[in-house]
From Swiss-Prot:
Assembly notes: Homodimer. Interacts with AMSH3. Interacts with VPS32.1/SNF7B and VPS32.2/SNF7A. Interacts with ELC/VPS23A.
A GO-annotated cellular component: plasmodesma
Name under which the protein is recorded: Vacuolar-sorting protein BRO1
Organism ancestry: Eukaryota, Viridiplantae, Streptophyta, Embryophyta, Tracheophyta
InterPro entries in the record: ALIX_V_dom, BRO1_dom, BRO1_sf
Gene behind this protein: BRO1
Stretches with biased composition (Pro residues): 824-836
Main location: cytoplasm
Species for this entry: Arabidopsis thaliana
PROSITE patterns: BRO1
Database matches in CDD domains: BRO1_Alix_like_1, V_Alix_like_1
Keyword Cell inner membrane: no
Amino acid sequence: MASSSLSNLMLAIHEKKTSSVDLYRPLRNYVTFTYSEREAQLIDDDLETLKQLRSDIERVSDPSPAARRDLLISYYKVLCLVETRFPISPDKDHVNAVSFVWYDAFKQKHKATQQNIHLEKAAVLFNLGASYSQIGLGHDRTTVDGRRQASHAFMAAAGAFAHLRDNESIKATIGPSTTVDVSVECVGMLERLMVAQAQECVFENTIAKGSTPGVSAKIARQVGIFYEEALSALIISPLKDHFDKGWISHVQLKAALFYGEACFRYGKELHEKEEIAEEIARLRSGASRLAEAKKSSRGAPAQLIEAMNTLESSINGNLDRAVKENDRVYLMRVPSPSSLSPLPAFSMVKPMNMTDILDASKEKMFSILVPDSSAKALSRYTEMVDDVIRTQAERLQQASELTRVRLKEMDLPDSILAVDGNSALPVDLKEDVEAVQISGGPAGLEAELQQLRDLKRVNQELLVHTEELLQKEATEDSQFRSQFGTRWTRPQSSTLTKNLQDRLNRFAANLKQAGESDVKIERSVRDNSALMSILDRRPIESAVPTLARPIMSLDATEDAIVGTLKQSLRQLENLGAQRAGLEDMLKEMKRKDDILPKLMTITGSYEDMFRKEISKYDHICEDISQNIEVQEQLLMQIQAQNEEFSTIFNLEDYKASKEKCYKQIQAAIMKYREIKENINEGLKFYVTLQDAITNVKQQCSDFVMTRSIQCRDMIEDVQRQMSGLSFQDHRSSGPYPSVHQPTASSPPPPPETQNPSHPHPHAPYYRPPEQMSRPGYSIPPYGPPPPYHTPHGQAPQPYPPQAQQQPHPSWQQGSYYDPQGQQPRPPYPGQSPYQPPHQGGGYYRQ
């Protein structure tokens, strides 16, 4: 059956109609008479709002069902506030000038007239359910989202009718002037009808998604059940003569249609399982139900009749096929329909809970209207309730604390758990062990040591490569100096690279010290591996000794003693859970204990009312007293059982061995953390050192490249001089003096070269790697080496002007020298990373 065939075959409820009523003047007069004109003026805006809401309810100003829904919800909340402040009744001291008139939604000639706000609330809830049903019917059920939204709307309609049935129907039908549409029977039927239509939307989505026949059959059967429940109310008094025949026919056909749909789809599943006999019985049952329903289909829509005919044809087709297969192949005996079990059903919907939607507790209207006597009485009653709850809560807390202390004194339940090998660690110790195991545990230390070795090797290789760069450049410079003699006038490599060599030497020293530290760490890991191995036990509780049973037993009663003690502990635990539940019951009862509406309408003595209301807490107080009494007796019983248990199982020796194990685990954790911290210090050191060496290597590479460029230029110039191709003008103005020309004063060397014996700080036991900014490199014009000991205070002489040959651009970027005082602070401290053993520091600690 295609879902589209039933796309418009659902029912919506029409709203009840009402007559105009003036609420403003009677309610204002009541406030003026009961309170004062001042209060009446203060609530005047609220009364105007109420008047406008009632006026909007009377006429349909906005035909949109969603707008009507919102209006009805707002008005219902205000009615809840009116109910608690304005007693509307024929009583002369109440608001007796207001009469509500509402017409039956299904028999509009019938009406109810009451001086009862519950009739007004019941009618508003009825119309709210009707609005939700119209919203559901208005959704486009040819799409997945449309069917889902329609289902939600029908569930909301069912929720509104259920709320009406449970809260207002009985109150609204008291007296001679009532209507059937708000009766318990009618709104109950409407709730089932709306739930059926919500489930039907789910079924349509199930078919559209191509669900399995078994799933579709269960959902279809539940649709039929909901329609059958609605039908059962429609065909009996007082509803059987209240609704049109078309209503009854519609619900009756829908019930039969979805029973047949369930049989049809369940039959498909049976056919796939080759359960042909039951398939035949189910299909016959569905066909019979459809045929029976069609007999009473007078007044039903033609589209619904067509859907039934289509389904009946499909069922008969499958039935004929199944009968032929059974006659030819399976030869199974077909059971009678009466012997079949009920079809499985699965509900996907339920009435929406309207409590939160209709909650008026946050509304501010009429908030000032609380009679003084009622307010004082409410305050006094609240104090009485608080005193009861406070006293009982203290008793419960004391009982729980007493249990905790007594069990701890008896070392329970830990000792009884240890008998079964379920020893437990203290929480803080267990958390420490778990942290160690998460970080890798002792078994993971070897991998971290290998990381140290790898990083050390990388640093050593990087350092060797850097030194080879400088050595190669110095060798080439010496060869050319030997070849060209005094004509090779640029500074020697050893002079320019002294600072770099010093740094590389310090790095080498640091690596040596680090290697010694690594050896100490590895030795510590080896020496303490036995101690730390306990941390690799999983679970760690397996390392804790168990409570051994006695080796010799004369009467073999230890099992009985253990079993009895366990049973007593379980009883004690149940008592604790019961106390928690009792405390929650007290709090929940107080939360729901709202007597303000009663206080605002009572005319008799408050004391009688207080005694009656506070008595509802008595049964919980009695349960608390009984719980505490039973616990006292049980604790005495447990103490006697535990003494016998301790004697038989030698509990004192077990406690001593357990404490020894705890201390061993704690010592292993401390040693692991110490080694782990030292390894982390080493890893951090090697990474920092690698960055520093890489930085120096880059400086050395730049130096070698610049010297190579300078070397080529200088070779060309020297070769020109030697071949007699140089010109005097160029020699006189060039930057390089001739061999017969006095050497111009060279600029003073940087501060570091002026004081080559500048003392470096004493190298620490483990010197962290240095790190310096990468300066640019500038080679002074080649010529005689500059004097490296310029007297203090003597200004350096500039080079003579050079008109012909300009220095290489890269020479202008700075100095190879690292002037003292300009070196940036290293990124690591200069103190020794190791502390002497007697200081208790880690190998790599700064």
